[in-house]
Amino acid sequence: MIHDYHITHFLISVPAVYCLPNEKIGMEVAFVGYSNSGKSSAINALTYQKKLTKVSKTPGCTQLINLFEVSPGIRLIDFPGYGYAKKTKKRKNYWHDVICEYLKKRKNLKGLILMMDIRHPIKDLDQKTIESALSVDVPVFTLLSKSDKISRNILQVTSKKIIHDMKMMFETHIQVEPFSVVKKYGIHSLKRVLNNWLR
């Protein structure tokens, strides 16, 4: 099914998983990743709306789960980033733990978009997030954000290495795509994956 992401609008912000809308109604895809990995920017690029989600240059600023509605019953979930270094270990892991709870409990979740800075790939909490998703058969699409920050040659080599490392690490194929809001890498692939999941 082809969705019109241009008309996506803000729905609600909630502080916890139990505050999310009734899971028996509709379908959703979640955007997750480390603080400042580009989740909000990816949603803005997907929807061609520069101000749909607030993009903060200060990591760890967002502390609410933001929901956006593509069409009635079709939602995108923007989770706060995990692993912000200036927080205590408990706080650094807090949103990762919330995401794992969400993965286990949310029956209408159709897939996970994992934003990963291509310059710092497959960090500890990213690995644990993928493992949690795979354990409950939730598909993962990894976007290598900030791909415009490195040269095209390094981008190709790094992307291949990440794909290889993830296949060895998880013993299965994880979809991986370079992504850049600036150079428009990966936006069409993101739409294709979302349309496939949300049908």
Swiss-Prot record:
Function as written in the Swiss-Prot or TrEMBL entry: Necessary for normal cell division and for the maintenance of normal septation.
Give the record's keywords alphabetically. Cell cycle, Cell division, GTP-binding, Magnesium, Metal-binding, Nucleotide-binding, Septation
Q: Where are the transmembrane segments?
A: none
Source organism of the structure: Blochmanniella pennsylvanica (strain BPEN)
Q: What is this protein called?
A: Probable GTP-binding protein EngB
Supply the Pfam families for this chain. MMR_HSR1
InterPro entries the record matches: G_ENGB_dom (IPR030393), GTP-bd (IPR006073), GTP-bd_ribosome_bio_YsxC (IPR019987), P-loop_NTPase (IPR027417)
Which gene is this protein's source?
A: engB
A molecular-function term among this protein's GO annotations: GTP binding
Q: Which family does it belong to?
A: Belongs to the TRAFAC class TrmE-Era-EngA-EngB-Septin-like GTPase superfamily. EngB GTPase family.
Q: Name one GO biological process term.
A: division septum assembly
Q: Residues in domain EngB-type G?
A: 25-199
Which cofactors are named for this entry? Mg(2+)
UniProt GO cellular component terms: cytosol
What NCBIfam families does the database record attribute to this sequence?
GTPase_YsxC
